[in-house]
From Swiss-Prot:
Function: Acts as a chaperone.
Keywords: ATP-binding, Chaperone, Nucleotide-binding, Phosphoprotein, Stress response
GO terms for MF: ATP binding; ATP-dependent protein folding chaperone; unfolded protein binding
Region described as Disordered: spans on this chain: 613-637
InterPro entries assigned to the protein according to its UniProt record, in alphabetical order: ATPase_NBD, Chaperone_DnaK, Heat_shock_70_CS, HSP70_C_sf, HSP70_peptide-bd_sf, Hsp_70_fam
Top-rank taxon, per record: Bacteria
Protein encoded by which gene: dnaK
CDD domains linked: ASKHA_NBD_HSP70_DnaK-like (cd10234)
Record protein name field: Chaperone protein DnaK
Positions carrying Phosphothreonine: T200
Induction: By stress conditions e.g. heat shock.
Organism: Burkholderia thailandensis (strain ATCC 700388 / DSM 13276 / CCUG 48851 / CIP 106301 / E264)
Length: 650
């Protein structure tokens, strides 16, 4: 059985890790980095770039370079968060036929799971290159506050990437696993994981206990905001720069997608620099032009200014902390350790706020970029049966229920319930002789169903005619270890049953997923063909170069006919290499022709080299013989007799 890899599929960056024995290994990608930007670029020639190569070309290809797609995964187009992003993103966010938020690149409509699958495929390939064997199974992390649709969409992304997702695990829980197994402290500890990533914020209160030699990680509560993260911090800087430039130059950069992409890059860089320095300078020459000529942007930003710009964003993270503490039934003073996860937690203002709320310094010995992937790899080892000393008890982040008479949300499973869990309740009909009931399933904390997220609905038909309130319909909610909901309804009188895994009227259908899996496989085959073609072209170029060089040096030793034959074969190979539509077979055939025609040339080169070596060896032998004769004469004359006396210690 192959290894189960751990993948942190992040909004801004992603990371992959595996366990080797009891040691964790965060794997470097093909560019040599331990994290990969979650950026995907669709090129004109149908090539798809992922990670650093995609990021590098984003300024010149803003409409087809997709980033922060995780913010759209499992979301409806109408959601206010999606509407907010439409005005900010250089790429197009569109409404799919089923009402979901999709994106567009080169006129092609793409589902967020399909785009995220490209990042997962890169993570899979990174692990395969390191292990030297195929990888088919993974544990993928999601923000703890992700709802059912978002979890299901993440699982779909894994399938499209060719991975069997063994478990969806919450990011703060994964970070706690990485932290807890790394520490030797005995006894029970309560920790708070504050996870502020590129697009999402989570906080979880987790108890780590030693139970009969096994470390038990029990999530007591979780809270968060799935639309708050580093991207929002970047946006505040971008808005500030646009405002200042407009005041100074009278030009609005927000309408220029190329300028916006440069601003995004500069804002991210400035934010990072201000985590260590007090001031930074944003310098972007030729940012735009008007009738008076080119315009340059030069702006100084201080750390104090940045903190003023994002103060309310940092403040927004504190209320979820307060709720999580309350829901866990603990006091702030009960928290032993505070762990920071996510790149945005490197900002001094964030650390200061966290310290102020929890009353203690956050731990500095956890890598905020890698802890989540490490935790996922540990969970992968547990699921493969190779590790028995860890037990993980996670929770469902939001309450689940159904709509009952009057549009009320009747909760079946409350938030922060340990999963997996199952709950059944009996309901009845609202009208006389009602032959069918529609079960609408919602997720959220509001009293009225309409204020919560509709996960899906289904019908139970064939209920025998009876007065209202008489039929007994048992509704069962079952949440699996991935936090994904399965619902069933059963008429107790007839035994009629209807079960669904919540697939809202949103989300990808089975047929769509299958098509995307097939497309991905076809792309992989196409990529392989392109790589083989590139290798043949390289081989052809190298052969042309080496043969021409050999002809220059040894051509005069060939008969005229032989030389002409080689030159003709070379010309044919050069022509086929110049033709962009040449396939691998055509190039390989011409390579073979040149190789065959050059045999005589090779023989001449070989004979010449052997003659040179023989000449050199003869000269070296003569020199060695002369040296030996001189050495022999020296030996007799140059012997020095020496007296010596042995000194004995008493």
């Amino acid at each position: 059985m192959g290894k189960i890899i751990g993948i942190d599929l992040g909004t801004t960056n992603s990371c992959v890790a595996i366990m080797e024995g009891n040691q964790v290994k965060v794997i470097e990608n093909s560019e040599g980095a331990r994290t990969t930007p979650s950026i995907i670029a669709y090129m004109d020639d149908n090539e798809v770039l992922v990670g650093a190569p995609a990021k590098r070309q984003s300024v010149t290809n803003p409409k087809n370079t997709l980033f922060a797609v995780k913010r759209l995964i499992g979301r409806r187009f109408e959601e206010k968060e999606v509407q907010k992003d439409i005005g900010l993103m250089p790429y197009s966010i569109i409404k799919a036929d089923n009402g979901d938020a999709w994106v567009e690149a080169h006129g092609e409509k793409l589902a967020p799971p399909q785009v995220s699958a490209e990042v997962l495929r890169k993570m899979k390939k990174t692990a395969e290159d390191y292990l030297g064997e195929p990888v088919t199974e993974a544990v993928i992390t999601v923000p703890a506050y992700f709802n059912d649709s978002q979890r299901q969409a993440t699982k779909d992304a894994g399938r499209i990437a060719g991975l069997e997702v063994k478990r969806i695990i919450n990011e703060p829980t994964a970070a706690a696993l990485a932290f807890g197994l790394d520490k030797a402290e005995k006894g029970d500890r309560k920790i708070a994981v504050y996870d502020l990533g590129g697009g999402t914020f989570d906080v979880s209160i987790i108890e780590i206990a030693d139970v009969d030699g096994e470390k038990q990680f029990e999530v007591l509560s979780t809270n968060g905001d799935t639309f708050l993260g580093g991207e929002d911090f970047d946006q505040r800087i971008i808005d500030y720069i646009i405002g200042e430039f407009k005041k100074e130059q009278g030009v609005d950069l927000s309408k220029d997608v190329l300028a916006l992409q440069r601003l995004k890059e500069a804002a991210e860089k400035a934010k990072i620099e201000l985590s260590s320095g007090q001031q930074t300078e944003i310098n972007l020459p030729y940012i735009t032009a008007d009738a008076s000529g080119p315009k340059h942007l030069n702006l100084k930003i201080t750390r104090a200014k940045l903190e003023a710009l994002v103060e309310d964003l940092v403040e927004r993270t504190i209320e979820p902390c307060r709720i999580a503490i309350k829901d866990a039934g603990v006091k702030v003073s009960d928290i032993d350790d505070v762990i920071l996860v996510g790149g945005q937690t490197r900002m001094p203002k964030v650390m200061e706020k966290v310290k102020e709320f929890f009353g203690k310094d956050p731990r500095r010995d956890v890598n905020p970029d890698e802890a989540v992937a490490v935790g996922a790899a540990i969970q992968g080892q547990v699921l493969s049966g190779d590790r028995k000393d860890v037990l993980l008890l996670d929770v469902t982040p939001l309450s689940l229920g159904i709509e009952t008479l009057g549009g009320v949300m009747t909760k079946m499973i409350n938030k922060n319930t340990t999963i997996p869990t199952k709950h059944s309740q009996v309901y009845s009909t609202a009208d006389d002789n009602q032959g069918a009931v529609t079960i609408k399933v919602f997720q959220g904390e509001r009293e009225m169903a309409a204020g919560n997220k509709l996960l899906g609905e289904f019908n139970l038909e064939g209920i025998p005619p009876a007065p209202r309130g008489v039929p007994q319909i048992e509704v069962t909610f079952d949440i699996d270890a991935n936090g994904i909901l399965h619902v069933g309804a059963k008429d107790k009188a007839t035994g009629k049953e209807n079960k669904i895994t919540i697939k809202a009227n949103s989300g990808l259908s089975e047929a769509e997923i299958e098509k995307m899996v097939k497309d991905a496989e076809a792309n992989a085959a196409e990529d392989h063909k392109l790589r083989e073609l590139a290798e043949s072209r390289n081989q052809g170029d190298a052969l042309v170069h080496s043969t021409k060089k050999a002809l220059t040096e040894y051509g005069d030793k060939l008969e005229a006919g032989e030389k002409e034959k080689i030159e003709a074969a070379l010309k044919e190979l050069e022509d086929v290499l110049k033709n962009a539509s040449s396939d691998k077979a055509a190039i390989d055939a011409k390579i073979e022709t040149v190789a065959t025609a050059s045999q005589k040339l090779g023989e001449k080169m070989y004979a010449d080299m052997q003659a040179q070596q023989a000449g050199a060896a003869g000269a070296a032998g003569a020199a060695a013989a002369e040296g030996a004769a001189q050495g022999g004469a020296q030996t007799a004359d140059d012997v020095v007799d020496a007296d010596f006396k042995e000194v004995k210690k008493d």
